[in-house]
Amino acid sequence: MSDKIQESYRQSRNIYDDVLTRSTWWSRLYMDIFWGGVDDNETARKVISYIPDDFSGKLLDVPVGTGVFTAAKYAVMDGAEITCLDYSVDMLDQARERFRKEEISNCRLVQGDVGALPFDDASFDIVLTMNGFHAFPDKEKAYSEVNRVLKPGGTLAGCFCIRGESRRTDWLMTRILSRKGWFTPPFETFESLKARLERGYRLDEYHKEGSIVYFKATKR
């Protein structure tokens, strides 16, 4: 990945959670105007609900971000072995501090590139990928690596931004967010992602809210 991505997320570290969680008036206004009022909190809850509270296997969270949506879930997953990877050192620092405050001890944080995951083949029972694929610069490598480290019969669950649902959102993604380094084209459409996933997975859940797709799939 590029230094531009590192720098873009370093610059946004103080507003990242506010935007995702709609916790300020300006973040709610931004989400309403440019994202059609989509509530990332609700989407995240749906995705995280695909993971059983009593899960006791190995889970990879990539990118972990700040852990704002996952910390509460991980706090009750005592039997799980969780690996949290992100390219951004700033995101990892925030996640580490959040997990420390929540006394979450079953998460290992790793700085790394989703396009070259430092794990063996078929290492994980679940791969969770929230708000990442619209930012990953080499999406083909990312898809390949996620598939490689997931066990056959394992679960891929996630959500991210897609194009083709709103002209206003598409403009924001290509003209603003991509230029800032927060997003990286090309972007999937609802149908292109479905076709891609169906080549290697059974789609158990596949939905969209505005320009956000969320899903649960089982690797064949």
Region annotations inferred by a language model:
Residues K58-A116:
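Class I SAM-dependent methyltransferase SAM/SAH-binding core
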Residues K58, G154-T155:
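Short glycine-centered segments of the SAM/dcSAM-binding site in methyltransferase folds
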Residues M1-D53, V68, A72:
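Conserved class I S-adenosyl-L-methionine
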Residues I126-D138:
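A short SAM/SAH-binding and catalytic strip from SAM-dependent methyltransferases
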Residues I51, V76-M77, L150:
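A generic alpha-to-beta junction signature in SAM-dependent methyltransferases
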Residues E140-P152:
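A short glycine-rich, Lys/Arg-flanked "PGG" loop and its adjoining helix->strand segment in the class I
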Residues G115-I126:
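A short acidic, Gly/Pro-enriched loop at the edge of an enzyme's catalytic core
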Residues A157-E209, V213-F215:
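C-terminal alpha-helical "lid/dimerization" subdomain adjacent to the S-adenosyl-L-methionine
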